[in-house]
Every structure is written in structure tokens, then in C-alpha cells.
Amino acid sequence: MACRRRYLSSLETGSSLSTDRYSVEGEAPSSETGTSLDSPSAYHQGPLVPGSSLSPDHYEHTSVGAYGLYAGPGPQQRTRRPRLQHSTSVLRKQAEEEAIKRSRSLSESYELSSDLQDKQVEMLERKYGGRLVTRHAARTIQTAFRQYQMNKNFERLRSSMSENRMSRRIVLSNMRMQFSFEGPEKVHSSYFEGKQVSVTNDGSQLGALVPSECGDLSDPALKSPAPSSDFADAITELEDAFSRQVKSLAESIDDALNCRSLHSEEVPASDTARARDTEPKPGLHGMDHRKLDEMTASYSDVTLYIDEEELSPPLPLSQAGDRPSSTESDLRLRSGGAAQDYWALAHKEDKADTDTSCRSTPSLERPEPRLRVEHLPLLTIEPPSDSSVELSDRSDRSSLKRQSAYERSLGGQQGSPKHGPHGGPPKGLPREEPELRPRPPRPLESHLAINGSANRQSKSESDYSDGDNDSINSTSNSNDTINCSSESSSRDSLREQTLSKQTYHKETRNSWDSPAFSNDVIRKRHYRIGLNLFNKKPEKGIQYLIERGFVPDTPVGVAHFLLQRKGLSRQMIGEFLGNRQKQFNRDVLDCVVDEMDFSAMELDEALRKFQAHIRVQGEAQKVERLIEAFSQRYCVCNPGVVRQFRNPDTIFILAFAIILLNTDMYSPNVKPERKMKLEDFVKNLRGVDDGEDIPRETLIGIYERIRKRELKTNEDHVSQVQKVEKLIVGKKPIGSLHHGLGCVLSLPHRRLVCYCRLFEVPDPNKPQKLGLHQREIFLFNDLLVVTKIFQKKKNSVTYSFRQSFSLYGMQVLLFENQYYPNGIRLTSAVPGADIKVLINFNAPNPQDRKKFTDDLRESVAEVQEMEKHRIESELEKQKGVVRPSMSQCSSLKKESGNGTLSRACLDDSYASGEGLKRSALSSSLRDLSEAGKRGRRSSAGSLESNVEFQPFQPSQPPVLCS
């Protein structure tokens, strides 16, 4: 009997592998097997794959094993029963996890429409106990998890202090100096040679090559000596190398200082070579050695870049842009007004025929804390945003080639003033003027001046908002209005008392629409769509803007766009810059921090300035990436502060600790008695400076400043929406599509367009008393919210929610009769569906009706265009999956911008897209709800739609919109 049991037990072990895949799905077992989920053969199984078949041998093993199991004694079954229940729960859990993974993969491959996304969130909220409970639980869990991850990362960083931080790109005192100058000779094909000298902590990597900006590798100026174990020897070698570079450069600098006339036709090319071999003047040599001593006093590597160009006269702006000048790029990166100064300089050179390069030096008179040599034409010395190794990698990735393209596009745009504002720095050039006149520098936060014809006309018709933060000033969609935004905080409020007096209140939005495109409604709409896409998915939005020519395809151009343009969610800016997976995002972050000057600032105050532009919040890895770049830039700007610590990485650890302190001190989820005290803050930073403590006075100062003033991000367009959301009280029913506001009004992509007072008309054929059914209308870029004044106080007004309508599929109609002379009718106009009247309004006067309907129609067109773009993208993806081997598309290349199929292939797919099922594009709740009512209809998402997917072909070269 015992032998038989051992034999059956061995058969059970063999049958477990065969019955595994069959029994996990819960299907009815075969009559031959007699197994089920409760059998012990299903217990020892891992993740299972459905759909597998069983061989005859497997059936035999299974039946015998099952027979042997149930033929056994009763006590054996009772002892195994708890284990079987545990096995069932484990298998069920694994099946649920697999289902979640499949749903995630599907969600990544197909983008749902906005109404389906809202419905998805609504279903999750219903599943987990309702909106309030779900939101509170999700917020608590997310906050706790992020705090846990931040603390975990902080402890990891503390424990890794002894490791080499070069892999983390904290090159704390790394100085990159770029010397460029222009001279009197005229050359038609200029090139730049980049020569780099780098000394790391181990004394290696001396003389690493840096590709030139034209993409070609230049000859090495210095050979790499053998690595030395003594760091002092490496510094000595650096001094020698630096001296040789300074000697070779000194004569060229001296020639530039001689202020030779532009009338000289040419200078032999050997002059430059002779200048490199001659000895420099003692004054210049001594000065550069003093700079060298200051640089080599810190610990990290020092990198020298010398961009040498044959001396050439200033070319006209249309020709100068063809030369990929690193000097132009560097000057454009200067914070404050240096970029504008450069454009003013270029204009002077274009106008003056006899000016020498020495007279161009006022463009560099702006004081900079970085290393600089006075009175040199176009001389820039720029600290790095990256290590020398990574810079070489970026050059190999042709980011410098993109920079050259950016320079060429700038040059072409400068040549035509009407396109100029969008390629160069937007703050220094007047709009649509026949000549380019320099203007005085303005701060980074200042906004563009506008041509006021359309603005004055619209302003005479309606009252503008006093608020001028990012959201309230950036959103009007009218065709005749271009409004300007500012970051002044003195007029941020919504001015509720003003709203209650005005019948129409338009939100300004100058930075959303470029004055150069004031007559191009479609172009401005595309720009706003790009901003909306960025505020939903940053990478997708940047790609959209680059493809349409609004943003240069360079890290420098994208960095300028993120810092200078309004209408971008600061939260999404942080999401984009904190992406560690994409090298382009990392390059943009380097350029962004290079725009900021943290000289002579305390660490917490510099961090406050950094966080004012970029919201440092989210996943711990992204926060670490942002703080890493900030710390690098801070140490470059403050080499004296770095020398106060034993290890430069202490700056990074301290900055990370400040973020933790600010989060802990101002988080509403942390109880007051559990908030971080001063002693806790000091204790957390004990021994982080290579075993030494940071001076207690420094930590006390940081703690007190954070306690008195929170690290906050500047307001953006979302801030204004949040203020409106706080003013709306009462029950907000959760209804999809047209019946409710939903759980959250303030979203990163939502902005306020206008505020208007209208009167609701229940029945257009019946009269009503004057002033009855007064409604306060808030028009957002994707939503129309109808409210009623709930309570009016002296300094505030609250509104009760009535209805909300999605703008997708909305149609705006006008009507007039003897009772309502200024009637407005809103209907649902999905192609092929029944027209449904949503609501009727009567405006107080014809002017308000015109302005409101213009804004509403433009907002509806914007939403429709975004949905069309989404469906186009899905069509291309579906076409690539269903018809990957289309013969007519085999010879067509993919677009370089995003890798999508060419437009000709896409247009062909519309005519012969029978392989695509209609259900694949029915991603709207309208499609789902109307499917049962009508047997066959056309929708915006189907191939039978009458919507024409014709690409927009601009009649002018793509330029950067303001």
C-alpha cells in the first residue's frame, strides 16, 4: 500500500505541470481528467497562460493523479484543504494582475477620448466607494508613498556619499569656457573647432575630443597624458594645457582688440596660425593665470572649450543665420537680457559699414558672475550643464546639428521682420515693423508687447480682467483679440465684485496667440492645441509644436519656450524636465538651468527661485533628477560656497533635504505634532559632508527661512481655474458628457476663456420677466459651466453649480423673436446623430452676444481639432498594425519628426481602410450611446465621417508663435 502511494504521488508531481494551464482559467474539466481548481495539482503552479492544450500523455497522468488523490485517506485531504484555498486565492490574484497588465498595455497602445477617460475615472470612483472617499484615499496613499520614496532616496544618497558621483552628473565645479570672436575678414564657409581639456577626480580624460558644431570631429589640440594617481600632477598638467591654450589665444585676442577697420578685404589665413604660435602679452597672460588659479581651487574637473573661427565681418541677418555660431547660441542663453542685447548688436552690425568688432562690446556689458574677460568682442565664458563626457555624447547624438538648424532658421527669420519674432528672443524685437530696433533689456518674467489695433478694438467693446496671472491672461479664443499675460502677483484675484458688475468678462491671453499671426486664426488655434497637448502629455505636445514650426527642434529652443511662454502648466514642465528616460529631455533641463543665475544666493533661496519656475513634485526619481541639475548649476555659480565643504556632493544632499523639509512642514496630511523640528532637521544631516557635520548656523538659517516662507511655484493658468472652482459651491453631480461638472474642475490642460452673464430661456416661445433666470457662465477651453449667484458679500461672490456641457460636438446657433432679441441656442451636433437642444440663452445686448459666441465657437473648433488630431494619430497606429505590408506605402519614408507614416500613405488609407473596424475608433461616449439607436451612422471617429483630414499647409515658413 505504501509503495502504491509513493507511485501515485510521483504521478501527481508529473501531472501538475500538465494540468496547470488548463485549470487556472476555471473552465469545466475534461471528462477524462476529473480535475478542478480545488485539486492539489493546481497548487504548486506559477503564472499560467490560457489556451494551452493537453497531450494524451498528460491526460493519462492527470486522471491517474486525480484518482490517486481522491482514493487516499480522509485525513490527508483535510490537512491539504487550507493550502488549496490559499492556492485558489493566489491564482485568482495572479489572474487579476494579468488583467490589469493587459488593460494597461491596451491603454498605452490606444488613446481614449476625453469623455471616455472621464468615464473611466468615474467607474473607478464608483467601484471604490464614491468620489469623496476615493479621492481622499488616493491622495493619502499617493502622498504617503511619495514621501516614503523621498525618504528612502535620501537615505540611499547619504549612504552613497563615498561613491564617485560622476555617473550622477554632479560635476559641481565644472567650468566650461567658450571663446568666440568675430573679426574683419569675410569668409563664405566658416567652421568651428572644439578643443577640450578635462581633468576628472582620477586625473584621466585629458584631451578628450568634442565634435564641432557642424558635426565633424576636429583634430585634438592636446594628447591625453597617462593617467596619474596623484591629483596634484593632474592639476599641474591642466595648468600647462591651459597655459598653452591661453598663449595660442592671446594673439588672436590682441588682434581683435586692435579694432581694425572693416574695409580690409581679407587677411591671409596664416595670420591665425601665427597668432597661435606667438607669445601673449604679460597682462593677459597673468590675468588668465589668476582665473586659472581660481578655477582649479575646487575639486571637480575643469573643461575648457575654445571655438575658433576665422575672423569675418558681420554678415547681414539673413546670411548670418546660415552659420552655426556657438556664440550666438551662448548669448541667447544668457538670463535677464543678454539674448536681447545680442540681437540689438546684430542689427547694429548690419546697419554700420565701418564699425569694428570692438564697438560691439556693449552687448556684453551686462554684469555676470561667471568668468569673463572684459572688452572682447562676442566673448562668452559659460559654465557647463553637463560633464565633458556627456557633452561629447550629446554632440555625437547630433544635438549640435539641431542647434545649427536652429541658427539657420533664426537667420532666415531675421531677414524677414514679419517672421522674426518667432525664431529669436521674443522680448527684444518689436512686432511687425519694417526695421529691427533694439530695445532695453527686460526681465525674464516680462511679457511681449503687442500690436494694439485688435486689442484696442476688443477692449473698447468689453471690459478685461484685472487678474494677470498665467491662466486668466492666456485664454480668450476670440478671433479679434490678442491679450497679454504677466506674472505680477498684485492683481491675481478674480475680482468677484467686478465680475458681479460686468456682464461680459474676457480673459486676456496675449502669449497664447502670436501678434504675427493675428490674422491667421487657424495658426493660432494650432498653437493653443499644442499647449493643450503639452499640458496633457508633455512629450506629445512638444512634438506637435516642433512639427508645426512653433518651437525649434533643439534643447535650447525648447528651454526658451518652457521658460518664456505662458499657458504651460508648471507641473507638466517639471514632468517633462524630470524624465530620465529620454536624453533630449535631459538636454533641455541642462539648458533650462543654464538660464538661471544663482550667484551670491543662499542654497534655499536659490532653490526657491528654481522652484518658482519648475514645480519640483511628483515621483522621487524625477525630483532627484531636478534637484541634481539644480545642485550642479548652483555649484557652478558659487564655487566659493563649494570650497566650504569637504565634498561637493553635500550641496546635492542638502538641497534634497530642503525639499523634504518643505514638504513635511507644509503638507496637510502631516499632523502638527509630527512635523519636522529643527533638531530633527539637523540630525538628518549629521555626517553628510564626508563624515563631518554641516555648520549648525547654516542649517538653522535654512530651517527658519523655510518655516517663515514656503517654497512655492509661481501661478499658472491652473491657479485661476482653482480659484473659480473654490467659488462654485453646492452639489456637483457626477455625470458624463453633458449632465455634470465631474469631480475635478482644475486640470493641467484646462484654462478659463471668459466669464459672461446671460439669462436662461426655458421656452423661447414664451415670454419671461426681465432679469429672471440669471446665469453666470464660465467658459473654459473644453467645458461650459452654468452657475447661479449663490451668495454675494462685500468682497466675494459664491456661485451654485447648475449645469456643465462639454464643447465637443457643440454647435452655436442664434435666434431672435419678439421676446428674446439676442437669443443663443446651444445644440449637440454630432455628425449622423439627432440634434439635441442643450440650453437656450438670451444675452443682455448684441455686443455681449457677439463676443460670447465668437469665443465659444473658437473654443469648440479647438476641441474638434484636438479630437481630429487624436483620431488621425490612432488611424496611423491602427493602419500600421492592421496593414503593415501595404504595397503603396512600402516606398514611402517615415517622417523624421515623430516616425509616423507619410501623409500620402495616410490619405490612401482613408479610401482603402476596410481592414480597420469601426469599433476601433468608437472612443466617444456619443458613439457608444447612439450605437443602439441608429443602425448605421457617421461619426467623427469613423472612416465614413465627413470630416476631412487634410493637413494644414502654412503659406509661410514655420515660425515661433508668441
Swiss-Prot record:
Question: At which residues is Phosphoserine found?
Answer: 89, 105, 107, 180, 248, 252, 511, 514, 891, 923-924
Q: Where in the cell is it found?
A: Cytoplasm; Nucleus; Postsynaptic density; Cytoplasmic vesicle, Secretory vesicle, Synaptic vesicle
Residue numbers spanned by region Disordered: 1-96, 264-292, 311-333, 348-516, 921-962
Residues in SEC7 domain copies: 516-709
**Gene Ontology biological process terms in this record:** actin cytoskeleton organization; dendritic spine development; positive regulation of focal adhesion disassembly; positive regulation of keratinocyte migration; positive regulation of synapse assembly; postsynaptic modulation of chemical synaptic transmission; regulation of ARF protein signal transduction; regulation of postsynaptic neurotransmitter receptor internalization
Which residues fall in a compositionally biased region of kind Low complexity? Answer: 8-19, 470-488
Q: Which GO terms describe its cellular component?
A: glutamatergic synapse; nucleus; postsynaptic density, intracellular component; Schaffer collateral - CA1 synapse; synaptic vesicle
Ranges for domain PH = 773-865
Keywords of the record, alphabetical order, are:
Coiled coil, Cytoplasm, Cytoplasmic vesicle, Guanine-nucleotide releasing factor, Lipid-binding, Nucleus, Phosphoprotein, Synapse
Residue spans of biased composition, Basic and acidic residues class: 273-292, 365-375, 429-445
Q: Has the keyword Nucleus been applied to this entry? A: yes
The modified positions for Phosphotyrosine read 910
Q: Has the keyword Repeat been applied to this entry? A: no
Gene3D superfamilies, A to Z: 1.10.220.20, Arf Nucleotide-binding Site Opener,domain 2, Pleckstrin-homology domain (PH domain)/Phosphotyrosine-binding domain (PTB)
SMART domains per record: Sec7
Q: Where is the composition biased (Polar residues)?
A: 30-39, 939-948
Q: What is known of its domains?
A: The PH domain mediates interaction with lipid membranes that contain phosphatidylinositol-4,5-bisphosphate, but does not bind membranes that lack phosphatidylinositol-4,5-bisphosphate.
Q: What does this protein do?
A: Guanine nucleotide exchange factor for ARF1 and ARF6. Guanine nucleotide exchange factor activity is enhanced by lipid binding. Accelerates GTP binding by ARFs of all three classes. Guanine nucleotide exchange protein for ARF6, mediating internalization of beta-1 integrin. Involved in neuronal development. In neurons, plays a role in the control of vesicle formation by endocytoc cargo. Upon long term depression, interacts with GRIA2 and mediates the activation of ARF6 to internalize synaptic AMPAR receptors.
Q: Which family does it belong to?
A: Belongs to the BRAG family.
Q: What is this protein called?
A: IQ motif and SEC7 domain-containing protein 1
Q: Which organism is it from?
A: Rattus norvegicus
